[in-house]
Regions:
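Short, amphipathic alpha-helical segments
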Residues: 136, 228, 247-248
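Conserved metal-binding segment of the jelly-roll/cupin
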Residues: 225-242
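A short pocket-lining beta-strand/turn micro-motif at the edge of beta-sheets
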Residues: 181-183, 222, 230, 249-252
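Non-catalytic, conserved peripheral segments adjacent to functional cores
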Residues: 1-219, 223, 262-265, 271, ...
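Double-stranded beta-helix
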Residues: 245-299
Length: 299
């Protein structure tokens, strides 16, 4: 059955950079507190390395680990299992336990339509938000694999060749002026204790009215731009869009959460018609995206 459709007004969201403090009301933004250019410090300097987090109190105090060759920051994110509160337990006195689950989502670039940019530059476009989901009893963490961080793409060519990790491939997205893939984190707080009326099409094709518990607060939707050096944890019950990758390259995410196999407990969805858009005003060339989509269509 398709997800219920909520009515909505026209809403345009302008994304901001993903930071620990800006995302704190909705979950956890995860990134290294160390300078991106740091490669091989001396062992004696590990305990006094600079912290790039603008709010050091938000970052756990590191401890030396691995025979004093590493710094361990713990905990860096909440890992929450609230399945003992699940609605499926009502009427039978016992819930089905949530168990840890690790998955991989290979996310391909989303289509943007022309427009937006607030007149500042031709790059970017509009992303139409047509669906939100939430996991009412579990956090959900997305960890991107193999994507350069935003700082990596700004290094001069001669510095790339001198890195202790080896020279980068000349075809990397960070070279030759190609934008590094980024992703949008689109969220809406839950209106706890409230309900909203939505329309659903039943198995017979008839429209029915249903009530959505703890619906998304669409007036306070936000979007954040994240790069490959950042992971994100959605708080339990936080409404969010499925992952939105922008650019010309697939991004693979390792996803960590709890689940119990009961659809209504694990994931709840609401859909929308036209009206909610994110103005993706960033280093994404809409013409290149259209050419990329044409190439994919020919495969």
């Amino acid at each position: 059955m398709p997800p219920p459709i909520l009515p909505t007004a026209n809403i345009t969201i302008h994304p901001s950079p993903l930071t620990l403090s800006s995302f704190h009301p909705f979950g956890t933004a995860i990134s290294s507190p160390l300078p991106a250019t740091l490669r091989a410090p001396s062992a004696t300097s590990l305990s006094s390395l600079p912290n790039t987090d603008p709010n050091p109190s938000d970052t756990p105090t590191p401890i030396l680990a691995n025979q004093s060759t590493a710094l361990k920051y713990s905990p860096i994110s909440v890992f929450q299992n609230n399945y003992d509160q699940s609605k499926s337990a009502e009427g039978r006195g016992k819930s089905k336990d949530g168990v840890p689950r690790m998955s991989m989502f290979s996310c391909f670039p989303r289509a943007l339509r022309r427009g937006g940019g607030r007149g500042r530059k031709p790059a970017g476009g509009l992303f139409d938000v047509r669906i939100l989901e939430r996991h009412p009893y579990t956090t959900q963490t997305f960890i991107p694999l193999g994507v350069p961080s935003g700082v990596d793409r700004k290094r001069p060519e001669n510095e790339n060749k001198s890195l202790s990790t080896g020279a980068r491939n000349k075809h990397d997205d960070g070279d030759n002026g190609n934008p590094v893939p980024s992703y949008l984190v689109i969220i809406a707080p839950s209106l706890h204790g409230q309900t909203a009326q939505a329309t659903v099409v039943n198995a017979q094709g008839r429209k029915e009215q249903v009530l959505i518990r703890d619906p998304p607060d669409l007036r306070n939707m936000k979007a954040f731009i994240a790069h490959g050096g950042q992971a994100v944890t959605y708080g339990a019950g936080t409404w969010h869009a499925p992952m939105v990758v922008v650019g010309r390259r697939r991004v693979d995410f390792v996803v960590v959460q709890f689940a119990n196999g009961i659809a209504e407990d694990d994931c709840q969805e609401v859909a929308f018609g036209e009206g909610i858009v994110v103005d993706v005003d960033m280093d994404v060339d809409i013409t290149e995206m259209e050419e990329y989509e044409d190439e994919v269509a020919k495969l």
